[in-house]
C-alpha cells in the first residue's frame, strides 16, 4: 500500500481535493496533462492518456482549467474502478500509467495499528474478507457504518465537502473506514476520550497541511507520537507496544511534552486508570449510533447487499442476555465511575428500564410549567432540549489525528499555536512581578492598598515596625478582641477547581457528544458563602460596653409589647416589612426587577391608544385657533350663538326644523358599505371636518361638574370610556354590562380613592385627564337642536353623563414658563411649515402677512426668526417681498410636523391662557401667577393667593407630583371645585405632617419641662405605676416592666389621650404631631371619604329644589356666616367663644323683649331637644316673630331651657317650611351635624383651657424660683409712621406719593431740605430698631450694658443723617467727558440698552432702523477701513487734509445718542465718508468705490422703508406734520400740561373725581370735566377752535362753583386755571387764528372735493392750498451758513410749496457739492416767498443772532425750534426722482415771540453741553449745526420737553385708561431715570394708537 493511497483516503476523510494526488501527480498535472480526465468527454474524443485528441479549440490554459474540473468526482470515480480491478489480483501497490506510484519498501503498515479491544477481530476480518464478503457477520455490527459508507463511495463518490471547522459524521467515518475487500486502511490512532475542544479544530486546514507534509513525514511524526504515548516504546518491540494501553487511555488529560496538571490527572474520582471503562460500552456505542442513524443506514446496507450477492455466509447468534440475567463483575462494579443518581438513560444502553415509575427530581422544579407544556414524562425520559447527538466514532482516533495534524502544521508553518494552558487566568496576569522576595526592595515603595492588609506587615518608610503597621491598618493590640471565624482568603469553588464544567459547554447544539441533563439546585449547608437564614436578634457590638442605642432598644422592647397588647399603639408592621421577604427558592428570574414601578403616574389600564381625528392631529384652524383675544378667552368652551351675516338664518322670520332620522340611517349605511368595501374590520371615519358634525352617528351629552376644568379637549379629539371594575373576593359573577365603554378589571384604583369589591365605575379617559362619569337618564321631553347657517335640525338624545372631578394626566405649563414658550415657538414653526406645504409655487413661497394675520400677538422679529431657519426674504426679482424656501432646506414630512406639536399640548396651552385671563379679570397682575422655581415651590405654595393656587398650572402639577409620591394633596381646601367639600383640592402639602395653621389663639411660647412636675425624669416609679393603674393597665403587666419601660408607657398613653382631648394627665404627653405613617393613613382615609361622597352625590337621581325663597334664606345664612368669619379674623377668637357670646347676646335681647312685652305666658310651650313651638303664624308680616324653646343639658347633667326669638321673615319662613315639609330624620341629621360641630368646639375649648392652666402653673413656678426680676417696660403699639412730606410739608405721606398736592409740579423749586430733619431722624430711629421686647440697655450694679443692636441702629441713623440729597435741577450741569474716538469693543459687544426705554418712542425706532442699516453696511466686503476712525499715528497727514472726519463707528455712536431726527442728516454724514475718501484717496480709488457701495446700500435700504421712515419723522416732529390739526392740538396740549396743570394746588382738577371718595358728586354734576379728559379730547382732535376748548375749560369752573360753592378754595383754584388758560391763548392768538383758518379751509376743501369726486372721478386727491393763501411777499428767510443739511424731498414740513418756480430755485440752490463750497460758489441765494404760518413762526433778528452765536442762557426757554424744509412735496414719487440730486435745505431755529418765563419748551443745559441734551431728548425741533472737529461742543442743541412731572405709575394708569397719546415722546437717559426729581410727560405716537 503506497503513500498515494493514504493521500487519497485522507482526502475522503475530509481533505481538500487540491491535495488528493501525490507529488508526482501534481507535477504531471502542472505540466498540462494531468491524470485520466473524464471531463475531456464533454468537448470531444480523448486518447488513451485521457487527453483530448488532435488540435482542439481549447488552448493549454483552458485545458488546465478543464483538468481541474475533474475534482468534481468524475476522475476519482474512474480511478477507483480501475484501482479495484488492479487490486483484485494482488495486495501490493501497482504502478499505474496515470501516475499512481508503488508503495515504498520502508512504508509503515498502518493496517496493524488498531484499538486494543478490536485488534484480533479486525485482523480476522481483514484476512477473511475475500471469503466472507457478506454484511451480517459475527462482528459486523461494529463496522456496519464503515462498510456501507465504503461501498457507497465506490458507486458514486460524493463531492468534496466545503472546508469548515466541523465535519459531518460521514466524513469522519471515512477516516477510519475499513473495506472488507482489503483496499481500506486504518490510520494510527491513540485511544483517548473525545474532547469537545477537539471538535473546534479546522479539519480542512489540518488535513491540507498533513497532505502537504508528505506521507513520509507523517509517518515519522506518528511514530514519534507513539513513542511519547505508548508504554515502554523505546524498549519493547513496536508491535508489542501496540497491544498495551497508552498513557492517554489511562490518563485522558495527559499531554506529551506539556506541563502536567495534577488536579486534572489525579482529581477526586480520577486517580483510577480507566482501563475497563470502555470495555462493555464499545458495542453499545455502535448500537446506539445504528439506532440513531435510522433509515439512512438501512438504505446503504441494502445497496451493499445488492453488490455482495455472492457472499452467502450467514451467522445466527442468540440475542445478548439482559443485564438482570447476568451477575455483575465485582471488579467492574468497583472500578466503574460513580454515576449521578439524577441522570437517566438516553439510549446509550440496551438494558430495560425498571417497571416502577421513577420521577426525575428536576421534573417538578421551578421549570415545571415548561416541562408540562413540552409534555415531558415524569421520569424525564426522552428530554433532550432539542439538541442532536453527534454520530459517535472512535473518538480517540479522531482526536489523535487532529493533534497529529496540528503538530505537523505547527512544525511546517513555524507558527506556535497557543496551547490550552495559555488561556488560563494564571498565565494572563504578571503575578510574579507582585511577589515581594525581599522586604528591603519595597521599603521605599508604597504597597497596593487593597492587598496590603492581606499581605501582612512589610517594613517600609511609612511602617517601620509592626506596631506602626497595626495603627495604620486600624488594628488594636489587644488579644481579647474577637477574631473573624472565617479565613481571610477567598473560598475556593470546588466545582470550578475539581469539576469538569467545561464538558457542559455547548459548542454545537446540533452536534452534541452527549445529551445534557437539567441541573438541580442543591444548597450545601456547609457552604461558607451561603447565608440560609436571617438572625433573629441583632448581634451585640464587639465593644465591651454596649452602645446607648442598643440599650435603649432592648429596654423599650417590653414597653412596646405592652402598649401593643393594650391597643394604645398598633403593632408596627413596618418592622416586618423592613425584613426581606422570603423568596421562592425556584424563582430565579428576578421578578422584582420587572414589577411596574410606582414612581410614575398610575398607568392606564388596558390599551389607551387614542386616535384623534385628522383635522385635530393636523391642528386645523377652526378647531385649534392660533390666537384668542380676551373675549374668546372669557368664552372659552362656552361659545355664544353666532349671528349669521348670510344664509337662510341671516333673515328674520320663521324657519323650518328638519329631522335627522333618515340622514343618520343613510350615513350609517354609507359608512358600513365603505367598511365592507375596504375588507371589513375596524375603520377610522373621522378624516375630514365634515365628519365631525353632530348630524349623524350616536351622540351623548357630558356635563362637567367643574366650572373651569384644568384641561378640556378641543373639537375633533378622541376620548375613551373605560368601565373600571374590581372583582369580588371568591367567586365573582363578572362586571355588569354597560351600554358604553370597554370593561377593565383593576386591582388598584386609578383614582384617588379605591373601588369597593364588586363596584363598577365608568370614566372618561384620554391623554389629558381621567374623570369618573355617571350615567343619567335623559328626560323624554328633552331633545337637541342643531343650528347651522342653512337651518335648524332636530334629533333625539338618549343618555347624558355627569363628569366628576378630573384627574389630570398632562401638566399645564405655567405662564411665561419654558414649556409655554417652547410650545408657542413650535406652534408658530408648524404653522409656517404647513403654509409652505400649501404653497403651489415653485420654489415654495409665503408672505409675512399671512403669518401676522394668524399670530397678531407675535412680534415681527419673532416671526422673522422662525422664518430665517427655512426661508430667505427676496427683495428683488419675481419673488420680491416673498419668503422663499431655501433650496437646501428639507421641509419636514407630515409625521414629523405632527410630532412637533400634539393636540394635547395645544389644549394645555389654551387652558393656561384662559386661566390667565380669568386671573387678570379678577385683578391679579402678571407677576402674581408666575410659575415658581422647583426648589422653592413648597414655600411658594404657602404664600400665593388662593385664586392663583387654583390655577390649572398649579393644580395639575400638584396632582401629578402626588401621583408620583413626591408630595400629598390638601384634599380639602381652596382648590376644591365644588366649594362644599365634595371634591378634591389639588394643592401640594409635604409628605411629612406639619402643624396646622388654623386661626386659633396664638399658642404661648413653649417652654422646656426640665425641672417642672411635667418632667418625666422626676416622676417617681410609684407615681408612675399609679398612673398606669389609672390608665387601666393590668397589675401583672406593670410588675414585668422596669422603671424606664414604665415611663415609656406613661408617656405614650398620655400622648394618645391628649390627642383625643380627654387626658387628665396631659402634662406628660409628648410629640403631639402625627407620625408619617398615621399621616399617610389619615390622608388615604380622607381621600376615600371624598371619593365615596363624590360618587354618591354625582350618581344621585334626586331632583334638587329650585325654590327662590329657600335660596335667598340660605344666602342670608351665608352672609351671617361670612360676618362671623370676619369677626373671628379680626378678634382672633375661637368659634366656641363666638357662639357663646352670640348666645349670650340673644339671651339678653330676649330678656329685654320679655320685659318690654310684660308677658310671662311664653313659658308653657316647652319642647325637648331641637323641638319648637311656632306662635303668631297667622299674624301680619310686619309683626311676626318666632319663639323657639330649646332644652339643654349642662356639664353636670342638669337641664335648662333657653328661648330664641326670630323676627326675620325669611328665617321664619324657612324654619316653618323645614318643620312642615321635612321629616324628623332629616331634622335629626341636621341637628346631629350641629351637635358634632359643638362637640368639636368643646374639645377645642378643653385644649385651650389646659394650655392656659399649664401657662399659669409655669408662671407661678417662675415666681417661686427667685426674686422677681424687673419686668421689661411694656412698649405701646407703635402707631402708624407719621412721615412728613418733603415737598408740601404735610404729614402722612412722602414727596414721591402721588397724593401729594405738589406731586405734579415741576417748575416750582423743590422744597425738600438737603439734610435730614430732626423729625425724620426720630422716625428713622424708631424704624431701625426692630425688636422692641429685647432689653437694649441693662444696668448691672454700676455698669450700663448697651445692646449690640442699639449701637448698630445708632450708627445707621447717623450715617443716614449725614447724607445730603440735592435735586438734580439745583445742581450745575456736569460736563461729560468725551468718549474716545476709538472704541475697540464696539463690534464685539452690543451696547447696553436700558430696560426702561420707551417701546413706542419713534426716535428709538428710527435709531434702531438706522443702526440696522449701519450693520448691513458693515457686513459688506472690504469695508473694514471705514469701521473705525483713522489712526492719526498711522496716517499722519489725514487730519490735515480732512477737516470733518466720519466713520461707521462714529455714525453708530451718533445714532445711539439720537442725533439724527431724520434720515437726511444720517445720509449726509454717510455721504461725508464718501467725500472724505474721494478727497484723500481720489475718486477712482478702490476705497472710494467701496464707500460708494456703502452709500448705495444705504439708499436702497432707505427706499425700502420710505413709508415707515416718513411716519416716524412726522411722529418725532409733530409741528411739521402736513395736517394743521396736529399742530393745533399740540399747542393746546402744551397749554394744558405746562400752564394749566402747573397752577399751584390744581391737583384736584387733574383727574376725574373718584366716585368712592365723593359718592354724591355725579348726582350733583351732570357734565363732569377735568384736565385729563381735556387732554384726551385734544389727543382725539376734538377741538378745532379755541371756543370749543374754552367751553370745556369753563365747564371745570362751573362745576366747581356748582358743587363746592363760589367761596371754596377749589373754586378759586379753578378760576386761576381758567385765567391762565385765557392768558396763554391770548399770547398765541395770532398763531392759533391762522391755524384755525387753515383747518377751516381744509374742511371746506374736503367737502368740495367730495362733491367733485362724486361728479368727476379724475379729480386729484387732497386739497392743495393756493399760493395767495400761503405766501407773503414781505417775509424773508434768514440763512445760517453752517446749517448745511442734505434732505431729500420726503422731509416733513409744516407747509407745502407746490410752486414749480420754488422747486427749481431750491434744486439749483442745493447743488451736489459740499455745503460750504456751494455757499461760496453761488454767493447770495434768492429767497423764496414764505407763508403766513412761516412768518408767524419766524424768530426776531435778535433771537436769531443769539441762536447763531450759541449764547443761549440757562434761563432761556424757547418755545420750540421748528425744523422747516423748503421742499414743496412730500410724495414718494418726487423724492424718488430727486434722490440723485440732494437739494440743500436750510433749517432755522425758530420760536414764538414769548417771554422766557412763558415758554413751553426748554433746553436741558446750555449750548456747550449739547451732547447731554441730545442724550436726554428724543425730540429735535431745531437745526443740527455741524460741530467744530477740534471741539467737544456744538453750537446749538435740541430742546426737550420740560415742565410737567408725571410718575411712572401714573403714566401706566393713563395709558391703560385713555390709550396712547400722539403729542410728544421723551426718552429719559439712564441718569435721569435714576433720579427721583426728574420726570417728563411721555405719551405714545399715533403709530401705535388704536384711535
Swiss-Prot record:
Q: Which stretches does UniProt call biased (Polar residues)?
A: 1690-1708, 1830-1840, 1858-1867
Compositionally biased residues, Basic and acidic residues = 995-1004, 1139-1148, 1254-1270
For bias type Pro residues, the affected ranges are: 156-165, 1659-1668
List N6-acetyllysine occurrences by residue: 565
Q: Where is this cross-link: Glycyl lysine isopeptide (Lys-Gly) (interchain with G-Cter in SUMO2)?
A: 570, 583
Ways its activity is controlled? Autophosphorylates on Ser residues. Inhibited by retinoblastoma tumor suppressor protein, RB1. Binding to TAF1 or CIITA inhibits the histone acetyltransferase activity.
Q: Where is this region: Disordered?
A: 1-34, 154-180, 197-224, 535-556, 990-1009, 1128-1148, 1254-1278, 1651-1676, 1690-1891
Q: Which UniProt keywords apply?
A: Acetylation, Acyltransferase, ATP-binding, Bromodomain, Cell cycle, DNA-binding, Isopeptide bond, Kinase, Nucleotide-binding, Nucleus, Phosphoprotein, Repeat, Serine/threonine-protein kinase, Transcription, Transcription regulation, Transferase, Ubl conjugation
InterPro entries attached here? Bromodomain, Bromodomain-like_sf, Bromodomain_CS, TAF1, TAF1_animal, TAF1_HAT_dom, TAF_II_230-bd, TAFII-230_TBP-bd_sf
Q: Which residues carry this modification: Phosphoserine?
A: 328, 1690, 1693, 1799, 1802, 1820, 1847
DNA-binding region per Swiss-Prot/TrEMBL record:
1216-1294
Cofactors: Mg(2+)
All copies of the Bromo domain together span 1397-1505, 1519-1628
Task: Specify where the region named Histone acetyltransferase (HAT) lies, as residue ranges.
Answer: 538-997
Is-annotated flag, keyword Coiled coil?
Answer: no
Residue ranges annotated as motif Nuclear localization signal: 1372-1379
SMART domains attached to this UniProt entry: BROMO (SM00297)
Q: Name one GO cellular component term.
A: transcription factor TFIID complex
Known catalytic reactions: L-seryl-[protein] + ATP = O-phospho-L-seryl-[protein] + ADP + H(+); L-threonyl-[protein] + ATP = O-phospho-L-threonyl-[protein] + ADP + H(+); L-lysyl-[protein] + acetyl-CoA = N(6)-acetyl-L-lysyl-[protein] + CoA + H(+)
Where are the residues of the annotated region Interaction with ASF1A and ASF1B? 1363-1650
Q: Which Gene3D superfamilies match?
A: Bromodomain-like (1.20.920.10), TAFII-230 TBP-binding domain (1.10.1100.10)
**One of the GO BP terms on file:** positive regulation of transcription initiation by RNA polymerase II
Q: Quaternary form?
A: Component of the TFIID basal transcription factor complex, composed of TATA-box-binding protein TBP, and a number of TBP-associated factors (TAFs). TFIID consists of at least TBP, TAF1, TAF2, TAF3, TAF4, TAF5, TAF6, TAF7, TAF8, TAF9, TAF10, TAF11, TAF12 and TAF13. Interacts with TAF7; the interaction is direct. TAF1, when part of the TFIID complex, interacts with C-terminus of TP53.
Family classification: Belongs to the TAF1 family.
Q: What does this protein do?
A: The TFIID basal transcription factor complex plays a major role in the initiation of RNA polymerase II (Pol II)-dependent transcription. TFIID recognizes and binds promoters with or without a TATA box via its subunit TBP, a TATA-box-binding protein, and promotes assembly of the pre-initiation complex (PIC). The TFIID complex consists of TBP and TBP-associated factors (TAFs), including TAF1, TAF2, TAF3, TAF4, TAF5, TAF6, TAF7, TAF8, TAF9, TAF10, TAF11, TAF12 and TAF13. TAF1 is the largest component and core scaffold of the TFIID complex, involved in nucleating complex assembly.
Q: What is this protein called?
A: Transcription initiation factor TFIID subunit 1
Q: Which organism is it from?
A: Mus musculus (Mouse)
